[in-house]
Swiss-Prot record:
Enzyme class: transferase
Gene3D superfamilies: Spore Coat Polysaccharide Biosynthesis Protein SpsA, Chain A (3.90.550.10)
Function: Transfers a GMP moiety from GTP to Mo-molybdopterin (Mo-MPT) cofactor (Moco or molybdenum cofactor) to form Mo-molybdopterin guanine dinucleotide (Mo-MGD) cofactor.
EC number: 2.7.7.77
Residues annotated as binding GTP: I12, A13, G14, K24, D72, D101
Molecular functions per Gene Ontology: GTP binding; metal ion binding; molybdenum cofactor guanylyltransferase activity
TM annotation in the entry: none
Keywords: Cytoplasm, GTP-binding, Magnesium, Metal-binding, Molybdenum cofactor biosynthesis, Nucleotide-binding, Transferase
Family: Belongs to the MobA family.
The protein's name: Probable molybdenum cofactor guanylyltransferase
Amino acid sequence: MPVHMMMSGIIIAGGRSRRFGTDKRRLRLWGEQGPCLLERAVALLQPLCSEVLVVLNDAHAWPDLPARLVADEQPGSGALGGVISGLQAMQTPTALVIAADMPVIVPALLAALAQWPFVGDALIPSSYPHPGQLQPLLAVYRHSALAPLRRVFAAGERRLQVAVTALHWVDPGPELWQMYDPTARSLLNLNTPDDLKLVQAYLGTTNI
């Protein structure tokens, strides 16, 4: 696994968790002595990136998080606003972007994304095994993506999956999944309490 590439790691952490009912970022799925969800996300990116940024609305609540905290430029604007804020704040030409609520991302998949060659503004995988839905919160963005995303945002769009179609983006294709995550477990996220039950069941039967 590469160590400290000249690439930023950006975690979109938000802060509302309205559908979840509690602050899911503080869940300790790996035991009381283990990391919380947000700490785990930081730990995933640290070996790969020269800096790790966390975009969130409540930086004051995370004084001990070992990352650079970035205030969302447009609080309440969703993941698109978070990605824009992260790209604006990063100090490298490229960023590996993930969401804070994806607890079972395969580290080897992240490393592969970080090294995957591509031309354009972004490297955005499609869902697997049934392609079609882009995964813009498990992706690589160049700084060149910032201006078009800002334009789309200014035009009123708030859906990240729609906004990224304004970019010159590349899909690494099914080979990425087949080589590094054939079950596509990395796409599991926590949006509702029912999602938590699924992830807990997965963690109970898988060594992660």
